[in-house]
C-alpha cells in the first residue's frame, strides 16, 4: 500500500510494486448498497500524462472527451466500446489547461 485517503463517504487506496511508478487505485464507496454495474463507470482505467494541456488539446480535437473536472485537474475520454479512461496529470508539475 502506497497511500490511503479515507473520507466519510469513501476510501481510496493506492497500491504499487515499489519498483516502478505503476499505481493501482482501489475505491470503496461506504454507503453503496446495490451491486456495481459496469455501465456506471465506477471501474475504469486511468493514465497519467506529463503534459495535461497537450493531452487535453489532442483529445478535444479527436472528440473523445466525455467528462471534465477542471477543479480536480482530470478528465475522461471514451473509447469506441463506451468505456471511460481517466486522464490525470503528473502531480509533480503545475496543472495548466490551454
How would you name each of these model-derived features?
Residues 1-23:
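Core segments of cupin and vicinal oxygen chelate
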Residues 2-4, 29, 69:
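Conserved beta-strand termini and adjacent loop/short-helix elements that scaffold enzyme active sites
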Residues 18-20, 34-84, 89-95:
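Vicinal oxygen chelate
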Amino acid at each position: 500500500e502506497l497511500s490511503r485517503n479515507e473520507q466519510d463517504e469513501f476510501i481510496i487506496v493506492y497500491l504499487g510494486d515499489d519498483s516502478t511508478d505503476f499505481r493501482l487505485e482501489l475505491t470503496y464507496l461506504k454507503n453503496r448498497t446495490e451491486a456495481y454495474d459496469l455501465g456506471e463507470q465506477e471501474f475504469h482505467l486511468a493514465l497519467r500524462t506529463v503534459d495535461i494541456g497537450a493531452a487535453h488539446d489532442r483529445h478535444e480535437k479527436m472528440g473523445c472527451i466525455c467528462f471534465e473536472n477542471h477543479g480536480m485537474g482530470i478528465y475522461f475520454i471514451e473509447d469506441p466500446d463506451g468505456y471511460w479512461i481517466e486522464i490525470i496529470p503528473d502531480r509533480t508539475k503545475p496543472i495548466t489547461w490551454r
